[in-house]
Regions:
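Extracellular structured ligand-interaction cores
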Residues: 19, 105, 136-140, 152, ...
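A short secondary-structure junction signal
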Residues: 115, 119-123, 133-134, 151-157, ...
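Non-heme Fe(II)/2-oxoglutarate
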Residues: 36, 44, 48-54, 61, ...
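Double-stranded beta-helix
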Residues: 148-211, 235, 246-249
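A short beta-loop-beta micro-motif enriched in histidine and acidic residues
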Residues: 97, 126-138, 191, 198, ...
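Short, conserved beta-strand element in jelly-roll/cupin
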Residues: 131-150, 197-198, 205, 229-233
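Non-heme Fe(II)-dependent double-stranded beta-helix
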Residues: 1-17, 23-123, 129, 170, ...
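Short, structured patches in soluble enzyme cores that scaffold and shape functional sites
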Residues: 107, 125-127, 143-147, 159
């Protein structure tokens, strides 16, 4: 029997540590369907006829780079169905203590095997890239579409970092992890890193203020995650102008 922690324990963990791991939400059939649908999108096959919001990897690009595509749910109904699944939404609402949740952005993050340094994502907070939200009430859910072990380059969380002040110099795009560790050490001499080693179909949730990163995938299989950014009824928008304003202009997409 698979142990399922009580909702109250998951709520407390998310609040105090900045992240939590849900039990298996999606069965193997659902994850396999979504996996194949995402691969179609990566290959430029759009079932709905609509392109994604943005592609950060094109066919013919370096296969060792992390493949990241924004809003793949627009391209394929199976992906749409995955991120709008009622049971999934109920879990997110329960754990975040929300009366209502809404997906406002999605990404596929496909980390190739043996990706080397190109598979590294630097330490960062999601909030530092989201000037259009206040920190409270905004979260990220990471759906594992492949088993994630220590060799896969799992997402790594710093326990309790959701309660820290901002640390200047940390950045998702900075692959020089050794230098980032120096910055972390100067700011916080004592901290604990937890790997999100979860099984296919499980989900990790983290706060917009939780520092996280990932190392290269040294395994023989891709590490595939469907990233779902969602807001709750207690999230507050901040008016912004320019390119960033488009992120929240199409909330009806999800």
């Amino acid at each position: 029997m698979i142990y399922k922690p009580p909702i109250k324990d998951l709520k407390q963990k998310l609040k105090s540590e900045g992240f939590c791991f849900l039990p298996n939400i999606f069965n193997s059939n659902r994850t396999n369907i979504a996996y194949n649908a995402l691969w179609d999108v990566i290959q430029g096959k759009y079932e709905t006829g609509k392109p994604p919001d943005a592609r950060f990897w094109e066919i013919g690009d370096d296969p060792n780079n992390i493949i990241k595509i924004d809003k793949p749910h627009l391209c394929n109904k199976k992906i749409w169905d995955l991120i709008t699944d009622n049971n999934f939404g109920q879990w997110l609402a329960n754990v975040t203590d929300a009366k209502r949740i809404q997906v406002w952005h999605s990404q596929v993050v496909w980390k190739p095997p043996c990706s080397g340094k190109k598979g590294i994502a630097g330490w960062h907070r999601d909030n530092q890239y989201w000037p259009f939200w206040t920190p409270e009430g905004v979260f990220t859910a990471w759906i594992a579409l492949s088993d994630v072990n220590p060799e896969s380059g799992p997402v790594r969380y710093i326990q309790g970092s959701n309660q820290w002040n901002n640390i200047a110099g940390l950045d998702f795009f900075d692959k020089n992890i050794s230098e980032q560790y120096k910055i972390l050490q100067d700011a916080q001499s004592d901290y604990k890193v937890i790997n999100a080693t979860i099984r296919k179909g499980q989900v990790s949730i983290h706060s917009s203020l939780t520092y996280h990163s990932s190392m290269q995938n040294t395994s023989q299989s891709p590490r595939v995650g469907m990233v779902v950014h969602f807001c709750t009824d207690y999230a507050k928008r901040i008016p912004v102008n320019g390119e960033l304003s488009r992120y929240l202009n199409c909330l009806e997409d999800t």
